[in-house]
Amino acid sequence: MSMQIKRYPTLDLADNPIKLRLLPKESLLTLCDELRQFLLTSVSGSSGHFASGLGTVELTVALHYVYNTPFDNVIWDVGHQAYPHKILTGRRECIATIRQRNGLHPFPWREESEYDILSVGHSSTSISAGLGMAVAATYEGIGRKTVCVIGDGAMTAGMAFEALNHAGDIKSDLLVILNDNKMSISRNVGALNNHLAQILSGKLYLRINESSKKALHGMPYLKELAKRTKEQIKNIIVPNCTLFEELGFNYIGPVDGHDVQGMVHILKNMRCMKGPQLLHIITQKGRGYAPAEKDPTTWHAVPKFDPAIGQLPYQNISNYPTYSDVFGDWLCNAATSNKKLIAITPAMREGSGMAKFANQFPQQYFDVAIAEQHAVTFAAGLAISGYKPVVAIYSTFLQRAYDQVIHDVAIQKLPVLFAIDRGGVVGADGQTHQGAFDLSYLRCVPNMVIMTPSDENECRLMLHTGYHYNNGPSAVRYPRGNGIGVEYSLLRILPLGKAIVCRQGTKIAILNFGTLLTQAKKVAKTFDATLVDMRFVKPLDIELINQLAISHQALVTLEENAVIGGAGSGVNEYLMRQRLLVPVLNIGLPDYFIPQGSQEEIRAELKLDSDGIMEQIKQWLAR
């Protein structure tokens, strides 16, 4: 990439924000054009999040031009839109390594750069963290400013409004920039709104506003009348401000987020303003690349592609369906015979394989937005009313609704089926997205049934079993990736807590939970070991475990979940309760957060491929 930078002469001068701030304001438009083209060239050659970054080029340039980063705090919610930020903060030469093993982190990451003040990956955390930093800045008294950039999608989460409510109450100096890239909040964009924003953020308006407050001090009736008059006039011109004003924020906008010089002008004014401020900008996701502008969802995260062609290559190199597709097909088939099936997702329709269901059964489908807590309790209400809710959710996002799983579903023994996608090693999105903990945090919940399919057919059978289980909640946990090509059998309800012996061996028994069964078969053959597809993490097949402990010299548990508290821990606990003294090796994910890389790279490094599993067992037996 260093050889190519000469094609971008203005960007070449802005390797970091200090150099960026030396550029004349007139050159910022050229800088934005070059930055957008550089981003297109880079991501198309390496893969990564794409459309969001194209939409925040002007905002990123304006923020680093106006604010004294890294002294001032700029926080990016989620982080999909932060590639331009990384490029402008000294990481331009490494941007092609993003999301790769030992490369740049896919999201802003504190360990990577002093400009990344908050590590992110999950949605809607920016305002809470930003408010904490703003309060700390008040204590410091050194003039540090804090800015939070949050998208209109992330603003749908309850946590964002909790933070807005608190910020409006305590009145700390905080700027929240609402990056509205769906036109979902307002279409009032244009010269009038941009001009109004400049007036409302200008020093003259602020002086008049403050002077009027002082003049009316001690005259509460006139003060309240003036306040209402100002709000009514403002709401006529800017109809969206009411909600944020009621929360205690001074609302400005909406303004054109692609007018970099206008943004610089407004941000310079707002940097001097006191109290909580909300700037509403309108941007276009995928800006500057026509295919991404037309279909920003498809171009949200992309593999390598040829920009000249304008089409993404077909990614599924396997002939077998993904587990998400297996779930989606099962869901559609189940809904044809049951009108009380209700499918729920927290803003992951495509990722969870639900697009076809949403189109075929719109009355039985609910996308509740980025609101995992609400999704689970919404499902509880449906279950109480006699419906059969299925919550499709990524493992890493179910963490956000843990109290609701316990308090609103499990305690009441409600028949909610959790279809947990992306269990285990997920890959390129790194620490925040690995599905490492679900078996551990669900296994301790009373009344919960937990199933781990070893292949796509077993996934279907377990979804069918969970759907027809009426004595409490159930969970089917499956990985990101493709099946292995097994034939489908007729759907049937599996006996609860019963495993299958896949291979009878001697001395060692391998108890496998999930899709590592393919690797385990090779290992079992090498050691002449008994191999068991455990199927159920809860309830365990304790009768079979009893037999294996008595008839074998050692047991090995295998899972793609944290070893601490996982399925293997459940086996250990049972053996100890029964005072069955047999050596057990628990193989799974280690006690640290797993960084980004391909699934194959990570499994090899963690010794969860067949060679690595054999090595772990050999070393253990040799002790």
Curated annotation (Swiss-Prot):
Name assigned to this protein: 1-deoxy-D-xylulose-5-phosphate synthase
Keywords for this protein: Isoprene biosynthesis, Magnesium, Metal-binding, Thiamine biosynthesis, Thiamine pyrophosphate, Transferase
Entry-linked NCBIfam families: dxs, PRK05444.2-2
Cofactor binding summary note: Binds 1 Mg(2+) ion per subunit.
Similarity comment: Belongs to the transketolase family. DXPS subfamily.
UniProt xrefs under InterPro entries: Dxylulose-5-P_synthase, THDP-binding, Transketo_C/PFOR_II, Transketolase-like_Pyr-bd, Transketolase_BS, Transketolase_C, Transketolase_CS
Function: Catalyzes the acyloin condensation reaction between C atoms 2 and 3 of pyruvate and glyceraldehyde 3-phosphate to yield 1-deoxy-D-xylulose-5-phosphate (DXP).
Pathway field: Metabolic intermediate biosynthesis; 1-deoxy-D-xylulose 5-phosphate biosynthesis; 1-deoxy-D-xylulose 5-phosphate from D-glyceraldehyde 3-phosphate and pyruvate: step 1/1
GO MF annotations in UniProt: 1-deoxy-D-xylulose-5-phosphate synthase activity; magnesium ion binding; thiamine pyrophosphate binding
Reactions the enzyme catalyzes: D-glyceraldehyde 3-phosphate + pyruvate + H(+) = 1-deoxy-D-xylulose 5-phosphate + CO2
Species of the source: Baumannia cicadellinicola subsp. Homalodisca coagulata
Gene of this entry: dxs
Protein origin, superkingdom: Bacteria
SMART domains: Transket_pyr (SM00861)
Required co-factors: Mg(2+); thiamine diphosphate
Chain sites annotated for binding Mg(2+): 152, 181
Residue numbers binding thiamine diphosphate: 80, 121-123, 153-154, 181, 289, 372
A GO biological process held by the record: 1-deoxy-D-xylulose 5-phosphate biosynthetic process
